[in-house]
Amino acid sequence: MMILNKLRRAAALFVLLSIGGVSYGAGLFSEPLDYDQAFSLNPVNEGIQLGLGAVLSGSALVCDKFVDIKKNEYNPDDWKKSDIAVMDQLFMRPYSKPLHIVGTGTMALAMATPAIFAIMPSSEWLTIGVMYAETLLIANGIKEWTKLLVYRARPYMYFDDYPQDKLEDGDWNCSFPSGHTTFAFAGAAFTTMVFCQCFPASNWKYAVAGASFGMAVLTGAFRMASGNHFFTDVLVGAVIGSAIGFAVPYMHTKNFYGKFERKPKTASASLTPTGFTVSYNF
C-alpha cells in the first residue's frame, strides 16, 4: 500500500510537471518573436564533433558490452557506509521504483525541451538537430567512459533490500556520474543557450531557462531520492551535461568561427609632413 501511494503521488507530480511544460510552451508559441540566425554548420566542425561523439559513445559501448573491461563481482565487505563522504551519506536512500520511473520521466521532459525550436524557420531545424545530436553523443560518451573507469556502488546497495536484478545485470556499480542528470542538464543547457542566442530580446528566455533547468534539477533530485545516486554523482552529471550543452552550440556561433578566420593582409602608404609612412597589416 505504501508503494502504491508513492506511485500515485509520483504520477500526480509527473502530470503536473507535464502540464506546466505544455503551458509555458503554448504561451511561447503565441508570442511573436524576433529571430536572429545565430548558428551555422561547418563541414570541418561537424566532422570533428560528430566524429568525437561517435568515437566516445561507440567505444564505450563496445568496451562495456563486448570487452567487459569493468568487473562486476559484488563483495559486501568492499562497500562500507563509513567510507562514504558525509555529504553523500545525507542523501542516501533505499531503492524506490516509483521514484525511479518519475526521474526517468523528468529526464525525458528536460531532453525534449529543444522541441520548442519548432517555432523557428524550418530552414534552421537541420542546424539545431545536428547540434543537439552532437551534444547528446559527446555527453553520453564522456558519461559512459567515466562510468566504465570509476567503480562506485549505487546507494541502494548499502541497504538490505537492494534490487537483485540490478546486481545481476551489473548496473549496481555504475553510480558515478548520474547519466539521467547528465542528459537532463545537457538538454536544459542546450535549450537555454540556443534560445537566448536566437531570441535575445524575448522576455520568454527566463521562463525557458527556468523551466528547462528546473526539470533537470528535479531529475537529479529524483535520482537521489530513488536510491540510484549520491549527491556527488548528480553534481558531476550536472556539470558534464551543462558544459557540453553550452559548449557545442557556442562552437557553432559567428564569434567562435571568427577566431579561426584569416584576416586579409593589407598594405598602405601615406605622405606626411615629416616623411613617407608605409604600414602592413597581417
Where do the language-model regions lie?
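Hydrophobic core of alpha-helical transmembrane segments in multi-pass integral membrane proteins
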Residues: 53-61, 109-116
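Interfacial/capping segments of alpha-helical transmembrane domains
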Residues: 65-81
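Short membrane-interface loop/juxtamembrane segments of multi-pass integral membrane proteins
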Residues: 82-93, 163-169
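Interfacial helix-start motif at the membrane-water boundary
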Residues: 85-112
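Hydrophobic alpha-helical transmembrane segments of multi-pass membrane proteins
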Residues: 98-102, 129, 133, 178
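Solvent-exposed, amphipathic alpha-helical segments
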Residues: 111, 115-118, 216, 220
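Structural signal for the C-terminal ends of transmembrane alpha-helices
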Residues: 118-122, 194-197
